[in-house]
Amino acid sequence: MPVTAPQTLGELMATVPSITDHLFRNAPKAAMTVYSQMMPGEGVRPEFTTWRDEQTAWRTTIAVHDQSYHMMSLHVRGPDALAFTQSLSVNTFKNFGVGAAKQLVCCSPEGFLIGDAILYRLAEEDFLVVGNPATTDWVDYNAQALSFDVTTESDPMWTLNKAKAREFYRFQVEGPKAWALLEELNGGPLPEIKFFRSAEIGLGPHRARGMRHSMGGMPGLEIYGPWVDYKAVRSLLQKAGAKHGLRMVGSIAYFTTVIESGWWAVPVSAVYTGAGTQGFRDWCSAQHAAMRMSLGGSYYSPDIADYYLTPYDVNYGHIIKFDHDFIGRAALEAIHDQPHRKKVTLVWNADDVLSVMSAMFEDSVVKPLPITLPLAATARMHYDRVMDKDGNTIGLATYPGYTANERAMMSLASLDPGFTEPGTEVVLLWGEDGGGARSGGNLEPHRQVKIRATVAPSPISQAAQSYRTAIGIKRGSLQEV
């Protein structure tokens, strides 16, 4: 009899000895392969000029990030749409009018992060969740499991999109010259748009919504409109922006924005353990993110729960509001006054980085894992072990990468209290536990090495920090608006 593949996450976990090891074996094991697959070559090339030139553009001229392909979108409609989405998010939805957006931060009943996304209020009873598929999956499941009068409709990311058409195109236009370009295309001054608010704007002959938001920490707008206008709007931006030094941002540079802006985009979603998420595991199928994700990095624990983060661990503590009931509230209230890890940036020691790179040209039998620029992650969910000088684990790091703007190799990290002050020296362990053996042949044999690192603020960039200060955003995460 042929063996039937597990149909749900619950069935999968019943058949594998360790879900951690299973996720380590999931391929591909190279971040740039993952990201280029998420953004198809027809619309978003890996590079339009060079990834270094494109990174520089969001600090010096204009960068256009094409977000039309890689994110999941999920409509939530019905008379209970506001109450339902509020029941899933740790932050309050007070003053959430039509045309506004909110951060949707979802937790498990045990208080660990599922993921976060952007929630747009398109109409009185029509909300749109856009972002990480782990988050849209959680929303979709709960719409069916909970007793709210809502319906959902999915607009899948391109790789899962059989129609090969989206409801909306989506471009992030940002940089010091972005406003001049947008006003030119609008035919005059733009309306005043507060952070996470939107307004109708003109793009030549086309109408679109412009939302105040940023990927790289510079002033700009996220603009979106009907898919039928996608190619025309893209061409218009490119032609009108040429004199301003506009650069289209390819898939390689796009995913380095989180290192500068300080967004922990893809946590290990806390759905693999806990009685409160058993229903999700029984619902979750092979098309959903929890079964497709890959895990990598130097941190290893057989207990997948050791990878979980709370909102406090990624500097979301200030947006948690206990003025409403939400999944995970009791658990978060119980730990509210306890010490928490803090999200920071780690700046890698340049000499140690060069030592790893130079090993590629040596004759040693087992070399360190090469550091791929600009993104060195070995999985969609990459977690490195961070230690003190005595070798004690003090936290986890993600998104190892380089930006030409900072001229440094960096990671985002969540560290124990006592190690989060800027200037603190720590050690990052580089290379997978087991030297690649856990990755099922998808990663070459290598040896682990220690890389010195220095703690810096998150976000790292002065541009990102000053931008948040100017518009009332607390450093490292979104302030409630």
Stretch-by-stretch model annotation:
Residues 1-103, 112, 343:
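Acidic, proline/glycine-enriched N-terminal capping motif
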Residues 1-41, 46, 123-481:
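Conserved, structured C-terminal
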Residues 66, 109-111, 376-379:
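A short catalytic or substrate-binding loop motif that flags glycine-/basic-rich loops and adjacent residues
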Residues 95-97, 106-112, 117-123, 141-142, ...:
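Short, charge-rich binding segments
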Residues 79-81, 91-92, 106-114, 125-127, ...:
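A short acidic, glycine/proline-enriched capping/turn motif at secondary-structure boundaries
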Residues 85-87, 115-118, 130-131, 139-142:
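Short, conserved acidic/polar surface loops in the N-terminal third of protein domains
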Residues 53-60, 106-116, 202-211, 394-396:
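Short amphipathic beta-strand starts and helix->beta connectors
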Residues 63, 72, 104, 117-118, ...:
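Residue-level detector of beta-strand structural context in well-folded domains
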